[in-house]
Swiss-Prot record:
Transmembrane portions of the chain: none
Family (UniProt): Belongs to the peptidase S24 family.
InterPro entries on file: LexA, LexA-like, LexA/Signal_pep-like_sf, LexA_DNA-bd_dom, LexA_repressor, Peptidase_S24_LexA, Peptidase_S24_S26A/B/C, WH-like_DNA-bd_sf
Catalytic machinery residues: S157 (for autocatalytic cleavage activity), K195 (for autocatalytic cleavage activity)
Function: Represses a number of genes involved in the response to DNA damage (SOS response), including recA and lexA. In the presence of single-stranded DNA, RecA interacts with LexA causing an autocatalytic cleavage which disrupts the DNA-binding part of LexA, leading to derepression of the SOS regulon and eventually DNA repair.
The protein's name: LexA repressor
GO molecular function list: DNA binding; serine-type endopeptidase activity
GO biological process, one term: negative regulation of DNA-templated transcription
UniProt entry tagged with the keyword Membrane: no
DNA-binding region: 26-46
């Protein structure tokens, strides 16, 4: 049986992951539960983990997985599980099993070739997007409407959003985005970077998901949106 605070935290984590695909930060959890310190959140997370409601994913910053909610047994949660490659998808990265590719009439897997357009900085911006280096064959279930491309991540500025160095991000081509979206931003037509977009009055803020990096503020004429994050592929 969970305490009131344990139940509140579990619901908050579960709802946030359904909305954004990313677990809330300790500060967000602390504020949501009206606690004075993050140590209280740490104790609640340990208690939920010991009771089998969540698990912390090793060697990843801010990585939690909800295993079950109250009323669902651990056996129910684990029944029928099998190993499948993990794919993080959604506009802010939602962890889901990679969907199985559909077969065509000849029994071959119907895949979509997505161009990999070089590397993108999740850190200090690097030179503008490079030309196509190779392609990835992905099942159509992974793709939303529109044209897509992929980029290889270099840097650690987005680790709190679950995006790590050497990950491959799937980007939908578009030149607009909502505040809070993770986007490929082209700065002064020279530097490309992967950051969270925030609008601050007439200015645009490119926000890292790592406290070691400062938010950068630009005039609207200096930043062009090159696409929005819709998926992430990680190789183990």
């Amino acid at each position: 049986m969970l305490t009131k605070k344990q139940s509140e935290l579990l619901r908050f984590i579960n709802e946030r992951m359904k909305e954004t695909g990313v677990p809330p930060s300790f500060d967000e959890m602390k504020d949501a539960l009206d606690l004075r310190s993050k140590s209280g959140i740490h104790r609640l997370i340990i208690a939920l983990e010991e009771r089998g409601f969540i698990r912390r994913l090793p060697n990843r910053a801010r990585a939690l997985e909800v295993l079950r909610m109250p009323g669902a047994s651990a056996a129910d949660a684990g029944r029928g599980r099998k190993f499948e490659p993990s794919v993080i998808e959604g506009h802010l990265g939602r962890v889901r099993p990679m969907p199985a590719a559909r077969d065509d009439e000849d029994g071959a897997r119907a895949m979509v070739a997505i161009p990999v357009m070089g590397r993108i900085a999740a850190g200090t911006p690097i030179s503008a997007l490079q030309t196509r280096s190779h392609t990835l064959n992905l099942p159509p279930e992974m793709l939303s409407q529109g044209e897509h491309y992929a980029l290889e991540v270099r840097g650690d500025s987005m680790i709190d959003a679950g995006i790590f160095d050497a990950d491959t991000v799937l980007i939908r081509k578009q030149d607009t985005a909502e505040t809070g979206d993770i986007v490929v931003a082209l700065i002064d037509d020279e530097e490309a970077t992967l950051k969270r977009l925030r609008r601050r009055g007439a200015s645009i803020a490119l926000e890292a998901a790592n406290p070691a990096y400062e938010t950068r503020i630009f005039g609207p004429d200096r930043v062009r949106i090159q696409g929005k994050l819709v998926g992430l592929i990680r190789r183990y």
